[in-house]
């Protein structure tokens, strides 16, 4: 399936000079959404994944059905202040400042295998922070899965040396 044909390009969003890859058009396409989840399942079905960790917010959209299909638990990695129990937190750089990802401290048992999922990898800062959360929990980071990779931004170079799955590259 040609996934690029299902992804809308939005020039100058969220600011001038940025070409935004809008996955909402992929999500509304039943065959496209099914294909994406099926592809991710096929690539990770035999990896012994205990948990899928989805990065807020679009990582939730792809991560939860993937976890279900893999027979794994789902862990939401949230922006600051969204979780109600004690958290691990990792700060990361944005082009316009800093942000933070958080995860409940009791979300993952030490030694469990985790696959991190998000819709897109650009600079890699958010995904690297997610990996830091998994490390703080003393779990095993199995790998990453992204629908889209923006290769010019070299985000995968910031990530640990684990398997990285992408379905579409620009």
From Swiss-Prot:
Pathway assignment: Purine metabolism; AMP biosynthesis via salvage pathway; AMP from adenine: step 1/1
Entry's EC annotation: 2.4.2.7
PROSITE patterns registered for this protein in UniProt: PUR_PYR_PR_TRANSFER
Keyword Magnesium: no
A molecular function GO annotation: AMP binding
Localization terms from the record: Cytoplasm
GO biological process: adenine salvage; AMP salvage; purine ribonucleoside salvage
Example of a GO cellular component annotation carried by this entry: cytoplasm
Reactions accelerated catalytically: AMP + diphosphate = 5-phospho-alpha-D-ribose 1-diphosphate + adenine
A Pfam family reported for this protein in Swiss-Prot or TrEMBL: Pribosyltran
Highest taxon of the lineage: Bacteria
Main localization (coarse): cytoplasm
Keywords per UniProt: Cytoplasm, Glycosyltransferase, Purine salvage, Transferase
The protein's role, per its UniProt record: Catalyzes a salvage reaction resulting in the formation of AMP, that is energically less costly than de novo synthesis.
Subunit structure and binding partners: Homodimer.
Protein name (Swiss-Prot/TrEMBL): Adenine phosphoribosyltransferase
């Amino acid at each position: 399936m040609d996934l690029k044909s299902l992804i809308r390009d939005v020039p100058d969003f969220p600011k001038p000079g940025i070409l935004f890859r809008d996955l909402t058009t992929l999500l509304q396409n039943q065959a496209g959404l099914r294909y994406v989840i099926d592809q991710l399942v096929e690539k990770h079905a035999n990896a012994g994944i205990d948990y899928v960790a989805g990065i807020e917010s679009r990582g939730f959209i792809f991560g939860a059905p993937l976890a279900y299909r893999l027979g794994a638990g789902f862990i939401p990695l949230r922006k600051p202040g969204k979780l109600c129990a004690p958290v691990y937190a990792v700060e990361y750089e944005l082009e316009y400042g800093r942000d933070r990802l958080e995860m409940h401290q009791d979300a993952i048992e030490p030694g469990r295998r985790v696959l991190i999922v998000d819709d897109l990898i650009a600079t890699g800062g958010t995904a690297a922070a997610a990996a830091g959360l998994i490390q703080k929990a003393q779990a095993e980071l199995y790998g990453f899965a992204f629908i889209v990779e923006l290769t010019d931004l070299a985000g995968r170079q910031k990530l640990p040396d684990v398997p990285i799955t992408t379905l579409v590259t620009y």
